[in-house]
Amino acid sequence: MLGVTVSFYKATVSFLVLINSIIENIGLFCYHQESLFWEIKMSTPLENYLSSCGNKPSAAMCAYVANLQQVASVNPKIAASVVNEIQNQRSHLKLIASENYCSLAVQSAMGNLLTDKYAEGYPEHRYYGGCVNVDAVEMEAAREAEALFGADYAYVQPHSGADTNLVAYWAILSAKVETPTLEELGVKSLNDLSDAQFAELRKRFGNQKLMGLDYSCGGHLTHGYKMNVSARMFESHPYGVDKETGLLDYDAIEKQAMEVKPLILLTGYSAYPRKINFKRFREIADKCGAVLMVDMAHFAGLVAGKVFTGDYDPVKWADVVTTTTHKTLRGPRGAMILCKKEFADYVNKGCPMVLGGPLPHVMAAKAIAFKEANTPAYQEYAQKVVANAQALAKALQDLGVRLQTDGTDNHLMLADVTSYGLTGKQAEAAMFECGVTVNANALPYDKNGAWWTSGLRLGTPALTTLGMGEAEMKEVASIIDQVLKGTKPGLTKEGKPAKGKIDLDPAVKEAASKRVQALLSKFVLYPELDLEFLKKEFVK
């Protein structure tokens, strides 16, 4: 019995010694990172990237991984969605005229603690203390914008195109209605007005007239469309395009302006494929006594890139110019106002007049984008955007597609898809199924209305950013034609052709999708980023 007990004791001791040895060895492996299993399980994504790239890490990839690592530590689903969006954008040809790809430097400028600072007011005139660095950022962005566009003054606070148009409208109303009224009443401030006097001023604000391009002819919602606040602020008198040519008729616009006598003559577009003669608009504005305002949100990049110069440069001729900072300008999602000195003080009151304050981190990104745009490389890019648009337009026309105004001078075109027996919405849906993003767009005086539409709006800014050229535009046109020819209207429950449903030939879908992916494989979005690594680390 004693022998058995001793043997059991020795076995137990040996087992404990073995366990202790294993524990010590695991500790050594952990300490020296010699265990691949432990390293994979416990290392961070950034450490994994650095160990995988040898002695040549990419600064862009390091920054991106570090950023996503921070995000994933709080909410992995958001990090996964960001990576999935990269995958999505790498998998689709982006032909939406209002979209582009901003640089990784622009993106990085937005991701910092500047977002934490309130900065109501304008530089060196803030309602909050501690804004010295936000002032520096805003003034730098404004200087870059003024240098880029040759503007008297730049106001870089607005968050969107709609916001910036509202600020511009109220700045003009303040300059041309409010200030004369205060002078007439012999007071210096709105706060000095009696209730009755303020009511009279409000009435004068509401009686002003706006003349902008009709929404159905390529104008924007904020240019006096009835469903938008602009038509409720002003008495809206939209002008159109010639029904035969689809072009602006300057003589007809002048005649209308002389009859209407608007406070604001507004030009600019979201779906007009030709350049605008702003010198001619200046002449019309002077003749009818209007303030000339231009919304160049869509083509600001073509102005910055010196494609539109002389009579076609809005900054040279307009009193007030508004623009977004994304689209052709390739900046962050935001906006700004460029104006003559006469309107600078009024524009500066955008906060608190319309805005609650700026987004400092976005203003920082705007400064980066403006700096990027003020280079020979960007001017070359802007020229290529138009060359690609014209190449795509010609290729589509060679395939029998009718284009509004018979071509384009800028970054976009309007294609009539009714010859394929489709509405714009059906064409949009079919293209997306094959990996091409476009948007349905009404043609002037469209019988299908503003929702179903008869057209597609196609733009080349994003494809040009990827590096595509005129040869690729021919392939894109061929893909569009192939998909639309292979699509028929779907049927309603009653068996009648529907305006929204489609019947896409599966063989066409497969063939077109392969062509799209073949094209995208040669022109990769953000090639600095290793998508497979990001998916492995952040998409679970």
Where are these regions (language model features)?
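A glycine-/small-polar-enriched, mobile loop at the entrance of the PLP active site in fold-type I
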Residues: 90-101, 112-139, 269
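Cofactor-/ligand-binding subdomain signature composed of acidic, glycine-rich
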Residues: 48-88, 109-115, 124-128
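Conserved PLP-enzyme active-site core in the AAT-like
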Residues: 140-400
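Short, Lys/Arg-enriched N-terminal segments with co-localized hydrophobic residues
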Residues: 16-41
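Short acidic (Asp/Glu) and glycine-rich catalytic loops that position anionic groups and cofactors
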Residues: 85-91, 116-123, 262, 343-348, ...
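Conserved PLP-binding catalytic core of the aspartate aminotransferase-like
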Residues: 402-470, 533, 537
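PLP-dependent enzyme catalytic core of the Aspartate aminotransferase-like
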Residues: 43-64, 68, 76, 450-540
